């Protein structure tokens, strides 16, 4: 099945379940940028619960800026702060040390635009997960109903402000988490959480994460 997805910053597990199950993906790069979404936000685990990490961005002043034109901000040394938070959260996880160099290399690359940064992170995560679903960036805003009527349009399906709905077909399969004795199981965090805690077995959670 062809799936339409938005750009996302270290996207949640549900997003990667869809990547795993898809035959091909088109990533929307011409929609209007939406604030307070996974496009520039991810959730990682901490001893006190989920921690949101938000990428500061710069727009061209228009209220409806295409996401492909949204630039990364240099404000406040956010990359260093985000990486410190990620390392602190997962340095004691079983697989962080094996993936750290690859993740760090992609994270600290030189990027001007948010979508390119997100795509680089997605690509390295897919490589570490062994996912080979082809992902193509859109060349224009897609009218799904007329252009891809058989596609599954999930461009607005994921939000950090709400839990994954059962009707979406996503099933949050429990797995080992570093802080679960303190916080209980935290569902649908960033793919980083699954990858660092389960390593190669993360694919099994992605495989079983959608209802038939």
Across the structure, where does each feature detected by a protein language model lie?
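Residues lining hydrophobic/aromatic ligand-binding pockets adjacent to catalytic sites
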Residues: 1-212
